[in-house]
Swiss-Prot record:
Name of the protein: Para-Rep C2
Active site: Y86
Gene, per the UniProt record: C2
Renumbered ranges of motif RCR-1: 7-10
Lineage: Viruses, Viruses incertae sedis, Alphasatellitidae, Nanoalphasatellitinae
Motif RCR-2: chain residues: 47-49
Residues in CRESS-DNA virus Rep endonuclease domain copies: 1-99
Lineage top rank: taxon: Viruses
Job description of the protein: Initiates and terminates the replication only of its own subviral DNA molecule. The closed circular ssDNA genome is first converted to a superhelical dsDNA. Rep binds a specific hairpin at the genome origin of replication. Introduces an endonucleolytic nick within the intergenic region of the genome, thereby initiating the rolling circle replication (RCR). Following cleavage, binds covalently to the 5'-phosphate of DNA as a tyrosyl ester. The cleavage gives rise to a free 3'-OH that serves as a primer for the cellular DNA polymerase.
Main location per the UniProt record: host cell
Keywords recorded for this protein, A-Z: ATP-binding, Covalent protein-DNA linkage, DNA replication, DNA-binding, Endonuclease, Helicase, Host nucleus, Hydrolase, Metal-binding, Multifunctional enzyme, Nuclease, Nucleotide-binding, Nucleotidyltransferase, Transferase
Co-factor binding details: Divalent metal cations, possibly Mg(2+) or Mn(2+).
Record EC number: 2.7.7.-, 3.1.21.-, 3.6.1.-
Length: 282
């Protein structure tokens, strides 16, 4: 039978034997570990009484393979605190991590996900999906990109060094494709920018409302050029808008942000005021 929570008893003769056994427990593989020394009152035998909460399910055979066959193992009863009290009633020898009461929310959701992603997918698929997305985003943002900036990218970078206002929309226009628009847009994600390929107004506003102080990058695919969402752009740039999807909220934000549109088409002058647009030709 497999379990994450086990208790053990290890009879030993020397301190070296005891310490060698304890050293086998890795912080990366467990949530909590504690052990204490005891001496049997009738025989005088020294033994280590311990408890471990592993991150993954493990069977008795797996424990013996990992920690050797000299210890006696049983599936633990009670919570972390109860097992800690039992194991340390005479002497505390070693402790890794912190005990958690049964049903406690002290441990972070991400830690629970990383212990057993498949279990969380079954129990709470929505939370598991968000955890997976967060992990993938962290990995993406940690990757170092090396490339030479093109002239238009240098011009755009200089524009972004200016203090943003509540009107200007920067339009990176490249009709041919392959100019590096999407490459630049995706790189901005690593600097905390909100990235969107467009879509329905309320879908965009709902996602942006999660953190509405971010700079904004619209990376519009060629196939969506005829459905450019000028409404969402202007609402987000104005810093006052309502997100009505799922959790309705009215947002009034003081912080001004940059908004860039990366597109294969020029802006439609009938949809946005001409003085709003700063075009950078790619």
């Amino acid at each position: 039978m497999a379990s994450k929570r086990w208790c053990f008893t290890l009879n030993y003769k020397t301190a070296l034997e005891r310490e060698t056994f304890i050293s086998l427990f890795s912080r990366d593989e467990l949530n909590y570990f504690v052990c204490g020394d005891e001496i049997a009152p009738t025989t005088g035998q020294k033994h280590l009484q311990g408890y471990v909460s592993m991150k993954k399910l493990i069977r008795l055979g797996g424990l013996k393979k990992k920690f050797g066959s000299i210890a006696h193992w049983e599936i633990a009863k009670g919570d972390d605190f109860q097992n800690r009290d039992y194991c340390t009633k005479e002497t505390l020898i070693a402790e890794i991590g912190a005990p958690v009461k049964k049903g406690s929310n002290r441990r972070k959701i991400m830690e629970i996900y990383e212990e057993d992603p498949e279990e969380m997918k079954l129990r709470d698929p929505d939370t598991a999906l968000r955890c997976k997305a967060k992990k993938l985003r962290e990995e993406y943002c940690s990757e170092v990109s090396v490339f030479s900036l093109r002239p238009w990218q240098i011009e755009l970078h200089r524009a972004l060094m200016e203090v943003p206002d509540d009107r200007t929309i920067i339009w990176a226009y490249g009709p041919d494709g392959g100019e590096g628009k999407s490459t630049f847009a995706k790189e901005l994600i690593k600097y905390g920018w909100f990235y969107t390929a467009g879509g329905k107004t309320q879908d965009i506003l709902y996602m942006y409302a999660q953190d509405p102080e971010r700079n904004i990058a619209f990376d519009v695919p060629r196939c969506s050029s005829e459905m450019m969402n000028y409404q969402a752009m202007e609402m987000m740039k104005n810093r006052v808008f309502a997100s009505t999807k799922y959790r309705p909220v009215d947002l009034c934000i003081r912080k001004k942000v940059h908004l860039i549109v990366f597109a294969n088409v020029a802006p439609d002058p009938t949809k946005l005021s001409e003085d709003r647009i700063v075009i950078i030709n790619c």
